[in-house]
């Protein structure tokens, strides 16, 4: 049982085009547990979850919000590159949908209750905005929270003079760590309201506070978050969100609203015989047995307005141009002409965006100069720090290497040079003088090595006279000419 006497929050995770799942959950909470929405202290959201949280807090039509998501996905699927096509402007589309859907006093209803997760560009920290001075500021906060770098553009939008990007980058599920926060996510995992996949894999991945279980269904959902699936698939996701919200309410004992259509007693005519009365009683007993099952089946259906809006969004218009464009020869010709039409469409869309960007050019150019300067300064400081750390060590290594390469093995007769070497090294003040002294000592050591006393045997250099029987006295030994004494 969910404790009604305590305070609680609701948090919607960012999920791209899968935000239609949040529409189903929000519709279920608003229909079957309105006190859960009305008495919530805060309702948070990041990226696409911020759009649903805004619609839920401000009282906007959820059916229209769900239809807008499907319309945007259909618009993205029309193009060759999908949402990456140059002519598809997601930021402009989101802004137009919010202007059309939100009421005029939406900022007054959202003040203090709605929390939108943003990522500050300057330091990458997460910021939650809860106060808005106008409807335009509330819409701009949603635009900042849904702005994915490179996917939506290169220059991030501004809110109150600060640049922000997608809130899911820093915190995709705000306040998930609190026990009194009801977390909603379209990925199966440990969120309170999420799909229940029949997978035995216990491993999970946490992406900026969002629990995602490792299974094939979640891989499919991740692939469709930024590249939308077909409209009927999105409608089924909305229905799944509605059923998952209903299961959460049942599990926590919050589904207390009876269905008035099922509570009405059967109408029995006043004039009937006993047999007809018995048949009616028997049918009433069967209805009582089937009532819980029918009640569950009725509750699992989407609300009429939401279902109608989703169906209208999924239906393709039956005009002549649509029929012709769906024909196979036309589609083949369109695909073959893409290399020629894509540059032209890119040039046209680039020109339109440039004209729309003109009012913001001075501010954006100033920001780009500041960012470029800060990046260059950071790179220079980092290079200086690395040079300061490695240069002394490299110099000391080179000096040690020179000593190891220059110092030969000293014989015992030249030990005096090795004993005298540290004295003049310590007494020298200049590195150049020390190196010069070291070269001089090296030359002396080499001369000492090559100047070796050669001891010849006495009989090797003796001048022998021709052998005669009378001359037997040996000659006195003399030093051979040409050899200096050592």
UniProtKB/Swiss-Prot annotation:
Gene Ontology terms, MF aspect: diolein transacylation activity; mono-olein transacylation activity; phospholipase A2 activity; retinyl-palmitate esterase activity; triacylglycerol lipase activity
Matching CDD domains: Pat_PNPLA2
Disulfide partners: none
PANTHER family associated with the record: CALCIUM-INDEPENDENT PHOSPHOLIPASE A2 IPLA2 -RELATED, PATATIN-LIKE PHOSPHOLIPASE DOMAIN-CONTAINING PROTEIN 2
Ranges annotated as biased composition (Pro residues): 477-486
The PNPLA domain, residue ranges: 10-179
Gene behind this protein: Pnpla2
Protein name (Swiss-Prot/TrEMBL): Patatin-like phospholipase domain-containing protein 2
Residue numbers on the Extracellular membrane side: 30-42, 159-331
Listed EC numbers: 3.1.1.3, 3.1.1.4
Species: Mus musculus
Reported impact of residue 396 to A: Slightly reduced TG hydrolase activity
Transmembrane segments: 9-29, 43-63, 138-158, 332-352
Subunit field text: Interacts with ABHD5; this association stimulates PNPLA2 triglyceride hydrolase activity. Interacts with SERPINF1; this interaction stimulates the phospholipase A2 activity of PNPLA2. Despite a colocalization in lipid droplets, it probably does not interact with PLIN. Interacts with PLIN5; prevents interaction with ABHD5. Interacts with FAF2.
Record function comment: Catalyzes the initial step in triglyceride hydrolysis in adipocyte and non-adipocyte lipid droplets. Exhibits a strong preference for the hydrolysis of long-chain fatty acid esters at the sn-2 position of the glycerol backbone and acts coordinately with LIPE/HLS and DGAT2 within the lipolytic cascade. Also possesses acylglycerol transacylase and phospholipase A2 activities. Transfers fatty acid from triglyceride to retinol, hydrolyzes retinylesters, and generates 1,3-diacylglycerol from triglycerides. Regulates adiposome size and may be involved in the degradation of adiposomes.
Motif (GXGXXG): 14-19
Active site: 47, 166
Keywords linked to the UniProt accession: Cell membrane, Cytoplasm, Glycoprotein, Hydrolase, Isopeptide bond, Lipid degradation, Lipid droplet, Lipid metabolism, Membrane, Phosphoprotein, Signal-anchor, Transmembrane, Transmembrane helix, Ubl conjugation
């Amino acid at each position: 049982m969910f404790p009604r006497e305590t305070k609680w929050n609701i948090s919607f995770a960012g999920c791209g085009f899968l935000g239609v799942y949040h529409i189903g959950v929000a519709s279920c909470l608003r229909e079957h547990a309105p006190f859960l929405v009305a008495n919530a202290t805060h309702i948070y959201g990041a990226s696409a979850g911020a759009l649903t949280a805004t619609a839920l807090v401000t009282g906007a039509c959820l059916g229209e919000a769900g239809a807008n998501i499907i319309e945007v996905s259909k618009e993205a699927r029309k193009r060759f590159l999908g949402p990456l096509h140059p002519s598809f402007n997601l930021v402009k589309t989101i802004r137009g949908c919010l202007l059309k859907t939100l009421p005029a006093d939406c900022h007054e209803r959202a003040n203090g209750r709605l929390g939108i997760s943003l990522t500050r560009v300057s330091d990458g920290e997460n910021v939650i905005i809860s106060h808005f001075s106008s409807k335009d500021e509330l819409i701009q906060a949603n635009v900042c929270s849904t702005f994915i770098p490179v996917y939506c553009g290169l220059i991030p939008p501004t809110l109150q003079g600060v640049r922000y990007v997608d809130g899911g980058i820093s915190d995709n599920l705000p306040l998930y760590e609190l026990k009194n926060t009801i977390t909603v996510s379209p990925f199966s995992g440990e969120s309170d309201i999420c799909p229940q996949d029949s997978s035995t894999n216990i491993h999970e991945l946490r992406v900026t506070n969002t629990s995602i279980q490792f299974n094939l269904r979640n891989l499919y959902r991740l692939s469709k978050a930024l590249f939308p699936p077909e409209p009927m698939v999105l409608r089924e996701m909305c229905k799944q969100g509605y059923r998952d919200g209903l299961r959460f309410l049942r599990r926590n004992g919050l589904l207390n609203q009876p269905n008035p259509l099922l509570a009405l007693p059967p109408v029995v005519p006043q004039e009937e015989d006993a047999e007809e009365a018995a048949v009616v009683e028997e049918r009433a007993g069967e209805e009582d047995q089937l009532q819980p099952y029918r009640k569950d089946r009725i509750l699992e259906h989407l609300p009429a307005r939401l279902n109608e809006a989703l169906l209208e969004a999924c239906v393709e218009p039956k005009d002549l141009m649509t029929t012709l464009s769906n024909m196979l020869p036309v589609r083949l010709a369109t695909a073959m002409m893409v290399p020629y039409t894509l540059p032209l469409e890119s040039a046209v869309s680039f020109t339109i965006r440039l004209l729309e960007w003109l009012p913001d050019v001075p501010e954006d150019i100033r920001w780009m100069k500041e960012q470029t300067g800060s990046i260059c300064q950071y790179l220079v400081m980092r290079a200086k720090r690395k040079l300061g750390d490695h240069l002394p060590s490299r110099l000391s290594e080179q000096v040690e290497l020179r000593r190891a390469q220059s110092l030969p093995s000293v014989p015992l007769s030249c030990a005096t040079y090795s004993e005298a070497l540290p004295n003049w090294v310590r007494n020298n003040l200049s590195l150049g003088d020390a190196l010069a002294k070291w070269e001089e000592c090296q030359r002396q050591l080499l001369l000492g090595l090559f100047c070796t006393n050669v001891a010849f045997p006495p009989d090797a250099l003796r001048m022998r006279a021709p052998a005669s029987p009378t001359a037997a006295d040996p000659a006195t030994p003399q030093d051979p000419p040409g050899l200096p004494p050592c």
